[in-house]
Swiss-Prot record:
The lineage of its organism: Eukaryota, Fungi, Dikarya, Ascomycota, Saccharomycotina. It comes from Saccharomyces cerevisiae (strain ATCC 204508 / S288c). This is Histone-lysine N-methyltransferase SET5. It is an enzyme of class 2 (transferase). It comes from the Eukaryota. It is found in: Nucleus; Chromosome; Cytoplasm. GO terms for biological process: methylation; telomere maintenance. Its EC number is 2.1.1.-. The modification Phosphoserine is found at S517. Present with 5000 molecules/cell in log phase SD medium. Residues 112-403 form the SET domain. Belongs to the class V-like SAM-binding methyltransferase superfamily. Histone-lysine methyltransferase family. SET5 subfamily. Residues 450-492 are annotated as: Disordered. One of its GO terms (cellular component) is cytoplasm.
Length: 526
């Protein structure tokens, strides 16, 4: 037996035959991408390579066509689509916003450490400190969300007793003995809870949603129709609608009225208003997938024989069907919740949720790209702790960041515009915006088919300093990062600028990572 070491490639890195238009000697047919696919890949590129966010549109076009060599895409169409979807606006101040359509209830709240104050009609309310806080100090704790929402993608595991019926935690370490001793399983179905705490908090809601016939609660909820509603939400990844269903069910069970009271204090907006600003719809979209904005598709048969062909369904159709199933699950819901109010409940959840949950105090905190506070999530995404990121004085507004602070100003503001309806005007945004060489809209309109934007070499510069590459500007948080694109090309070993770790001996260590497109494989030749 002979053992031979061969060098192979990773992740289809060597697909030149396909990319060059041939595969196995035959012509490789190019496809025309949809507007959504183009927008998705542009935003995905920005997230993967933040430096390209500031690139010229010509360079952006080159990168997209390089990434998708099977696409048939002209430069003029590329530019037109990006302009229509506001993905290459040099002046985002002119684009549509929906902040003026958000309703802010006048309800305020306070405790010993913080208080909610009304700022103005534009900014709504904010959370303010009632005492001084030092850096790193815990400002407040929220032990639980208004209603706990299990992850939509874990419902299959939950229904089969493989994950907690309340929190979705995997149950691989839960023994049958513990389940029996602590009565952690449902008497009727396969549902299991991970702890007595989860069962106590969720058992009554589970009974209503899935076994309403046992407690004669069919008048307020039909268990069979609830399952149909949940299945529809799963099919279209409609997390917000599923969450609204759980919240409404909790309101019906809550004899204290606390759930409804806290929900009514939230800022609200119709999902119809939010969807108008969606710039893309897939994995690269700046419109958060958690916010119920995935592409809606369903399988279509061809003469009853061929299945699996997908067709797009517009949002309105999905909303209407979802509302119909919602009313079927809750027979009396239509008396107080019409279709428009249902959409408002969905929009309300989306603009107030934090990692899929709605928390009372956190929902009042406003955004800043250089915040003075940050959130720590503990106990399986249930408890939240708000820490001071820097010293906070009494009377100062407490702010967190809604978006990734390492993103460039354009991507940060675009995500804020689409997901929360406003453009950030913080000092950091203003400073970064001032570094851009703004291109007048008139010039964009008069650009010819070759995009009319000159490609600038990042190494070129003029004596007066007037010719600068927009790609040279980087946020202060990432200016020391290496050029990963060049490093990956060369397949060299390098050190990433990541937090240092301390071992048990007190020695500080860094992690070295090697990126290469090749892999060594031992082949048994017989």
């Amino acid at each position: 037996m002979t053992l031979t070491i061969k060098i192979g490639t990773l992740n289809d890195s060597d697909q030149s035959a396909v990319h060059n238009g041939t595969e196995n000697g035959s012509d490789f047919r190019k496809i025309t991408p949809t507007e959504e696919e183009i927008c998705d890949d542009v935003v995905l590129l920005w997230k993967e390579e933040p430096g390209t966010e500031d690139a010229t549109i010509q360079h952006l076009y080159d990168r997209i066509t390089e990434r998708n060599q099977s696409w048939k895409l002209s430069a003029s169409r590329f530019r037109k689509i990006l302009n229509e979807h506001h993905l290459y606006d040099t002046d985002l101040e002119t684009v549509s916003l929906y902040k003026d359509k958000i309703h802010f209830p006048k309800a305020l709240d306070s405790d010993a450490k913080v208080e909610v104050k009304f700022i103005d009609d534009e900014h709504g309310r904010g959370l303010f400190a009632k005492r001084d806080f030092s850096k790193g100090q815990i400002i407040l704790k929220e032990n639980k969300p208004i209603v706990y929402i299990p992850p939509l993608d874990k419902l299959f595991l939950i229904s089969n007793g493989k994950a907690c019926a309340r929190c979705g935690k995997a149950l691989y370490d839960l023994t049958q003995h513990k389940i029996m001793v602590h009565y952690l399983d449902c008497e009727v179905c396969k549902a299991i809870w991970c702890s007595e705490k989860c069962k106590k908090a969720h058992a009554s809601l589970h009974e209503l949603l899935y076994h309403s016939w046992r407690s004669n609660r069919i008048d307020i909820l039909h268990a069979g129709n609830w399952k149909r509603f949940v299945n529809y939400c799963e099919k279209y990844c409609f997390t917000a609608a599923f969450s609204v269903g759980l919240i409404y069910g909790s309101m019906l069970l809550d004899t204290t009225g606390e759930v409804k009271e806290q929900w009514q204090k939230l800022a609200s907006i119709s999902q119809r208003e939010r969807i108008k600003l969606r710039d893309a719809s897939g994995i690269g979209s700046t419109f958060s997938l958690l916010n119920g904005t995935t592409v809606h598709t369903e399988e279509e048969s061809d003469n009853g024989t061929k299945k699996g062909v997908e067709k797009n369904i517009d949002d309105e159709t999905v909303w209407e069907k979802c509302y119909e199933l919602f009313c079927g699950a809750f027979p009396k819901a239509s008396e107080e919740i019409d279709f428009e109010k249902f959409l408002t409940m969905i929009g309300t959840f989306n603009i107030n949720q934090y990692n899929g949950q709605v928390y009372h105090w956190i929902s009042f905190i406003n955004h800043d790209c250089e915040p003075n506070a940050y959130i720590e999530q503990v106990e399986e995404h249930e408890e939240l702790r708000l820490h001071a990121r820097k010293p906070i004085k009494k009377g100062e507004q407490i702010r967190i960041t809604y978006v990734n602070p390492l993103h460039g100003v354009r991507l940060r503001r675009r995500e804020l515009r689409v997901n929360w309806g406003f453009l950030c005007q913080c000092d950091r945004c203003q400073n970064e915006l001032s570094t851009f060489e703004r291109v007048p809209n008139l010039e964009k309109k008069n650009a010819d088919a070759n995009l009319g934007v000159e490609k600038i070499d990042s190494n070129d510069s003029s004596e007066d300093g007037s010719k600068k590459s927009t790609g040279n500007r980087k946020s202060s948080m990432r200016e020391a990062q290496p050029d990963l694109k060049e490093i990956l090309k060369n397949g060299k070993e390098f050190e990433l600028d990541i937090p240092e770790t301390v071992d048990t001996q007190g020695n500080v260590r860094k992690t070295s990572v090697r990126f290469d497109s090749n892999v060594s494989v031992a082949v048994d030749e017989r």
